[in-house]
């Protein structure tokens, strides 16, 4: 009632407060258009809070048509009057190019003004700019400093980032216990990346005691929020029976969720399950399909597995040239089995022209990683005997039966 009377007398403070009431439906019927109109009246009179609010209306299309250029103008007017939230929002406009030409230097300038007044969101974004070198030179120490200020005010994403800083010793002295502490704060606020990171701390015993049950607890929270890495890891723990009762059905369930979310490790794991009939009916065609998905995303293990599918005609038509293609991709990523397999193909002329030098080169790469069959193949080639052929037949057959679970 009194806000209305004062607003009718063009009092900008009253117009603003009445607008807040109409926007929220507090004491009056909710009316976003009326709220925006009242904000506009107060904004025209130079009232910074109303200018900022009107900017919000234009940003989100609340009570007015969405108009990012108008939003920018409103934020700019309020920011120049010292309105801290408008300064932060103006920084966002410059960072994203919303209503104005993208300008990271200007974004940093406005973030800094708001951050120095203690606005946590601005402190986090300023820290992020220093971390990424956006609008300023990279400065890990300043990045950590500003993120810590935001983290101490409860900004979960800043708490997670600060945990990463302490884990990696980036901008601060490495301290795994403090890393776990900040991950916990962020995880308890629901930050999915922090939940995964905290689960990993418990699994590895980094900064906290090793506790598989606690690891599973936090991985599950992240997995239930749709985090593909956590879903894959949870599948791994169910497959192994670590921190939970062993349950291959649930392992497959979580691997599948992760794989469907595009996680290459889970796709490879699911392929392994189908290849070995672990938790599912053995199906070499499905195994090859999942290996293909993972291989195309760059999974070296899947690339080698897919090469074997083509080499032996398991789930794919036999195609030695295709096998060599995938072996080569995996070998170049350092997979010893793939290096050995590629060497064998070069030695025997499978899918490529015979090339003893290439064969020896790849055998040596595998042998340097401790691959026993590669060592035998080298001995066989150097002695001119049949060692390589014998080793090759045995190793290639054995490779397809290896059960190798991958996890993050």
Report residues per predicted region.
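TPR/TPR-like alpha-solenoid repeats
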Residues: 6, 21, 42, 57, ...
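Short helix-capping/linker turns of helical repeat alpha-solenoids
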Residues: 8-11, 24-26, 31, 44-47, ...
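Canonical tetratricopeptide repeat
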Residues: 15, 51, 65, 87, ...
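Hydrophobic face of amphipathic alpha-helices that form TPR/SEL1-like repeat modules
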Residues: 17-24, 53-60, 89-96, 125-132, ...
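TPR/TPR-like (Sel1-like) alpha-helical repeat modules
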Residues: 39-42, 183, 219, 353-372, ...
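Short hydrophobic alpha-helical membrane-entry/anchor segments
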Residues: 386, 398-408
